[in-house]
């Protein structure tokens, strides 16, 4: 059922923008309101602004204004950086992985979440990266105790939306290495980036 829903572009765009809306909520501290209200306000603002930003990238891709090799290199770098950051349990991992999730659906990939062998890998990597993110003990020392409920709400929302772009990033990672074109690279045959017609 989840694979069926992910086959629709609108559903993928919605997940990407929702995850990216939670990415920078800690950097906004100028609002004179509760943490929960501030987080919801930032989510709405990021959702609207990044929706227009993503459509601009989609417009450039359809008009062939950007070379496919540029998107290929960008996508590879984002996969590597987000995977390492999440696996190491970094505190800012939700920022990078959310950017990855918002970028991938608009880079023209025709094979998105279609690898059958990727789901066991998702479960293993998600379980290994969940412990350092969910068991952080420094959150209660940073914030005042009067807003403990709001703080817990924000921490849980950040960690929850960390795993959504992480799954998307690992899906693209597995999909890339399972593609037949990658077998030619392993056999030391030269391949030009323009041959990656599947981008």
Swiss-Prot record:
For this UniProt record, the keywords arranged alphabetically read as follows: Membrane, Transmembrane, Transmembrane helix
Residue stretches spanning the membrane: 40-60, 86-106, 117-137, 166-186
Among its keywords, does the record have Membrane? yes
Topology in the lipid bilayer is annotated as:
Multi-pass membrane protein
Q: Which organism is it from?
A: Saccharomyces cerevisiae (strain ATCC 204508 / S288c) (Baker's yeast)
Task: Please classify the protein's predominant subcellular localization into one broad category.
Answer: membrane
A cellular component term, taken from the record's GO annotations: membrane
Keyword set includes NAD: no
Annotated S-S bridges:
none
Cellular compartment(s): Membrane
What is the protein name stated in its UniProt record? Putative uncharacterized protein YIR017W-A
Recite the other comments: Completely overlaps MET28.
């Amino acid at each position: 059922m989840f694979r069926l829903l992910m086959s629709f572009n609108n559903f993928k765009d919605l997940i990407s923008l929702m995850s990216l809306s939670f990415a920078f909520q800690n950097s906004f501290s100028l609002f004179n309101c509760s943490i929960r209200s501030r987080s919801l306000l930032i989510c709405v603002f990021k959702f609207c602004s990044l929706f227009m930003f993503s459509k601009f990238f989609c417009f450039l891709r359809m008009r062939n204004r950007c070379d496919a090799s540029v998107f290929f290199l960008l996508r590879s770098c984002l996969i590597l950086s987000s995977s390492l950051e999440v696996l190491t349990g970094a505190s800012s991992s939700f920022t990078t992985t959310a950017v990855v999730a918002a970028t991938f659906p608009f880079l023209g990939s025709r094979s998105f979440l279609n690898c059958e062998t990727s789901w066991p890998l998702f479960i293993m990597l998600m379980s290994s990266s969940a412990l350092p993110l969910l068991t952080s003990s420094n959150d209660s020392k940073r914030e005042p105790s009067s807003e403990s409920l709001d703080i817990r709400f924000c921490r849980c929302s950040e960690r929850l939306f960390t795993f959504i772009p992480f799954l998307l990033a690992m899906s693209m990672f597995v999909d890339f290495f399972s593609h037949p074109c990658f077998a030619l690279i392993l056999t030391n045959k030269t391949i030009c980036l323009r041959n990656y017609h599947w981008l």
